[in-house]
Regions:
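Intrinsic-disorder/low-complexity, polar/charged segments enriched in Ser/Thr/Lys/Arg/Asp/Glu/Gln
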Residues: 18-22, 48, 86-88, 102, ...
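Hydrophobic beta-strand residues in large extracellular and virion-surface proteins
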Residues: 10-13, 57, 87-91, 103-105, ...
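Extracellular/lumenal ectodomain signal focusing on beta-strand-rich modules
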Residues: 12, 69-72, 116
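Catalytic strand-loop segment that frames the active site of acyl-thioester-processing enzymes
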Residues: 2-44
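HotDog/MaoC-like acyl-thioester-processing domains
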Residues: 92-124
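Hydrophobic residues in beta-strands and at strand termini
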Residues: 27, 75, 121-123
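Hydrophobic beta-strand-centered segment that forms part of the acyl-chain substrate-binding groove
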Residues: 54-92, 99-100
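Acidic, aromatic-enriched beta-alpha/helix-loop junctions
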Residues: 39-60
Length: 124
């Protein structure tokens, strides 16, 4: 289940190879979260980007997951959902013996890299 219903929808998901996926996401610029973040100048909250990435990986793995560790997370550009509602997520997912998933994620909005993430997810 999505933490924020109607915040985004996956429009395309492609399995590139054993560990790599590309997921296209369409943000909903009308979502109520933007009334507070921020009025007249909507910006996707960074924590919501982390949630979108986690939920996309949960769908791919067909299992509930949670962040175990975030080794690095860089927010490189602001996403205004009115101007650039489409996101492209490049995901590398490697499963360890311990049921931990090593994640490399990069999000691109209108040709600008908006997030780079290196993290570990683990089953709930």
């Amino acid at each position: 289940a999505e933490l924020l219903p109607n915040f985004y929808k996956v429009t395309h998901s492609e399995h590139i190879n054993e560990t790599d996926w590309v997921v296209q996401v369409m943000l909903n610029p009308q979502h109520a979260i933007y009334n507070g973040h921020f009025p007249q100048q909507p910006v996707v909250p960074g924590v919501c980007m982390l949630q979108i990435i986690k939920e996309c990986i949960e769908k791919i793995q067909q299992a509930p997951l949670q962040y175990k560790q975030i080794a690095s997370c860089k927010f490189l550009s602001v996403i205004n959902p009115n101007e650039t509602p489409e996101l492209k997520l490049s995901l590398t997912i490697k499963k360890n013996e311990t049921d931990t998933f090593q994640i490399l994620a990069e999000g691109v909005s209108s040709k600008d890299i908006c997030i780079k993430l290196k993290a570990q997810l683990i089953g709930k």
